[in-house]
Amino acid sequence: MLSLLNGGDRGAFWRARHRPFIRRGHTERMSNDDVLPSIADAPGFPDSDRVPRKQVWAWALWDWATQPFNSVIITFVFTALYLTSDSFIDPAIAALGEDDPAYSAAIDNLASSLGWGITAAGILVALLAPVLGQRADASGKRKSWLGVMTLVLVACVGGLYFVEATPDAFWLGVGLIALGSIVAEIANVNYYAMMVQVSTPRTMGRVSGLGWGLGYMGGIVALVFVVLLDTFEWFGMDTSNGMAYRLIAVGCAVWTLVFAWPLFRYVPETQVRKRPTVSIVKGYAILVADLRRLWNEARSTLWFLLASAVYRDGLAGVFTFGAIIAAVAFGFSDSQVILFGIAANLVAGVSTIIAGRFDDRLGPRRVILVALGVIVAAGVVIVALHGVGPIVFWVCGLLLSGMVGPAQAASRSLLARVSPAGREAEMFGLYATTGRAASFLAPGMWALFITLFGATIWGTLGVISVVLAGMVLMLFVRTPADRGAVEPA
């Protein structure tokens, strides 16, 4: 891995990983309507029992490639430290200082406007994801769709260079980030669906965990670069007019372009029988029919989509509001928040890769339930021992962060295992849609608990309550792995 990052012999990198993942056996198919079906013998998996490791790593590197959009642009740096700063409010109001109510109101308005922009993006994803997933499956060109979406994402992130530090440029920044959020989610639909091309039923958990883990590691490396540039004062470059943040955006765009390339070079296009492409209206009619069929024929699959929509929103809330809890409730400085972000991504990345093996041995449902249980417990401790000080957040916050990745990766693995062959992109489109449909839960409970109890720390329980609700719903989901553990590959 280091040879690739440091510009070493890429050929040696891929040759060293050419040893294949081997399918050693099959999971028993079950026809019980109350149990999620197994697809160990489904034609959606590779025809060969061997998947070249270079294809696995090429696929997983796409997670690494796109992570800076989430960690650097959306979460920790561009929006938090630049787009919602006083660079984008009226200079006369900015001159009043942070203690003036007008200044605070202007900053709050920026944050609110950004939130509305991302909310609009979420609504569009909910409307478009399942239909575009159907079209990708019908055309048999998931990789082509992924390539187009990746290039648009690169353009959106690179376009943030033109967001100068003036109020007039604010909505350009919001628009580019919102559009980037849309294409990133749609790209994920096709990326997740391609997982069956680079894994077998015995290795799917490890492959999914590898992707998530590399994603977190990519976030760490990107954040470290930002810290180093700031530490060395950009090596004397002019950083006025927001140039530092604008160059960070360009760097993230180049990062995505470079590290996404291996997937398109080494992972072949899926080989499925093409189906007729239908209109948008017909696509929604098919979606309704699919939901009805899931209710009648595979109700546990529908339960999983519902449960995962709830707890995944809670997991998203953990990272969305974690930095706010650290800064407001525990008094972390800006540098401490970024340091915690690096540590959280490191812990999450390592734990996700390790948890992938437990996914293959014990089944993704058990991994999900254990991870959610630990998250709920850690969140309660953060609130209960808040008075002890920052050490509580460091310990429990990192423990909590270490469980988010395993839960997310196991969820992706579980759905890929039970998706009908040739319709994986459609199912992941539905996965994205249900997730977006529940995306108001964590922010709403966060705000409600703070309003009711009058302190930011109580918002933690609001987010944790969403995770707990999803965990309870997950108890109604049954998979073949629940009948017995799978032997390790």
Predicted segments, located by residue:
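Intracellular juxtamembrane helix-capping segments at the cytosolic ends
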Residues: 186-199, 406-419
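Multi-pass alpha-helical transporter architecture, strongest
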Residues: 255-266, 461-489
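Juxtamembrane intracellular "pre-TM" segments in multi-pass secondary transporters
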Residues: 39-56, 268-306
